[in-house]
Amino acid sequence: AGTGNVTVILNGKPSSMTNDQLVNLLKNMPVSNVAKAEVMYNAPAKYRVRGAVINLVLKNTKSEEPFVRGEVGTEYMQARYANGSGHANLSFVGKKLSADILYSADYQKRIIDNDIISHHKIGDIIYDIEQYNKGERRGLTHNMRAALDYQLSENDHLNMAYTSAITPNRKAVEKSSGNFSESSNSKMGDEQMHNVNVDYTSSLGLNVGLDYTYYNYPSTQDYINKTESSEQLFLADASQTINR
């Protein structure tokens, strides 16, 4: 039997980021930053989540001798178009303080190719419909994360993290041609997400936290559709904003 939706959490705490946003963050995070992954089909009540959970525990390294380490990486994929990504990570580890800065860029360009050939019979007449749909989608996403962990005393910890994903000028264009209609549909917009997480744990067992996510995606859609008997044109502005 299936487990339904799976919730991803970080360090045992739910996030106001969506699963897709968390997955995007983890895709761009060095493997060396992850201590372990815990899979639970029925999460305990302390996680405040129903159903299956994947708890990703990030490393919390401290060292008597302070040191700095870094990591860079790239990935290239060739399909119809070239796609690629790159990341750089810089970490500082000390006796009581550890800090981590991550930046990555991910460029994607995808082809859209969908042809429709159908035959419709109305009475004794067969109508042949052929539509050829082509287009592309592209976007360059900038992912950033800055995290700080400070050990105030042996059992007092303060964790702070800022995460963002920004895609300026995300664009999708589709065109359709055939014996039924001629159409063009384009959508453009600037997408951004920002998340702030603060967590404090005291030696008395007190835990206080703040998790806030801001998401904004204003977009413009330009649509034209022409048939033998009609013509449709519209220009629409839309905006999606989330504060939670």
Where are these regions (language model features)?
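Short acidic/polar hinge/loop motifs at secondary-structure boundaries
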Residues: 15-43
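Outer-membrane beta-barrel proteins
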Residues: 73-87, 127-143, 181-193, 235-242
